[in-house]
């Protein structure tokens, strides 16, 4: 009984950190997939790696939710904890969606814009990891808020690349099937950065409420 009343902040932050590690690793694999897409063996390795990373992250998500139900005193409000871990999980779900869609659609090529979006996503994910790693101490508040602002800027960069990519796609692509496939991949890639920005907004809210 008393165990349920004791704060277990450390375990929550440990799970956040472990999940954030998987996000960063997954984003590296996504860049590898986009850059080495023409190599069938490398492509398959990256897809399999992303699938394994997503499964590992799912375990951390489920463990966090279970801990939330078992713990009476939490490091910050329960709704924000659930929102944060769910949004973090969404990032890797989308990275996996990109990998699976590329395979399912049997894309003939990956464009420079898709590679640029993957690069931006990696930078976003690295900053998500950095912000999450600092979240256990509100002494890091200013640094966390700075990182969140960087994620917001990168998300705007992704929007600009997306607009340019779509413009060129509809202007230059003559194969309708290829156009539809690439459009879907672009949208998934952009959504990764959107989800990173959602995480940044949630973290920013936690910091402003608790600093």
Listing of model-derived features with the role each one plays in the protein:
Residues 1-211:
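Cytosolic, long alpha-helical scaffolding segments
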């Amino acid at each position: 009984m008393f165990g349920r009343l004791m704060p277990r902040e450390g375990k929550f932050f440990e799970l956040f950190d472990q999940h954030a590690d998987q996000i960063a690793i997954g984003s590296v694999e996504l860049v590898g997939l986009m850059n080495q897409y023409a190599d069938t063996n490398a492509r398959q390795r990256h897809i399999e790696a992303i699938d394994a990373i997503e499964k590992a992250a799912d375990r951390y998500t489920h463990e966090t939710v279970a801990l939330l139900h078992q713990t009476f005193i939490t490091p910050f409000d329960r709704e924000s904890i659930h929102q944060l871990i769910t949004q973090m999980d969404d990032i890797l779900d989308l990275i996996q969606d990109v990998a699976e869609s590329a395979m399912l659609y049997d894309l003939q090529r990956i464009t420079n814009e898709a590679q640029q979006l993957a690069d931006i996503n990696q930078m976003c994910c690295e900053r998500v990891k950095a912000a999450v790693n600092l979240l256990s101490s509100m002494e890091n508040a200013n640094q966390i808020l700075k990182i969140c602002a960087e994620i917001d800027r990168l998300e705007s960069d992704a929007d600009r690349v997306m607009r340019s990519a779509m413009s060129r796609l509809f202007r230059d692509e003559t194969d309708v099937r290829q156009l539809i496939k690439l459009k879907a991949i672009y949208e998934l890639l952009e959504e990764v950065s959107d989800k990173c920005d959602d995480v940044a907004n949630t973290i920013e809210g936690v910091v402003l409420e608790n600093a």
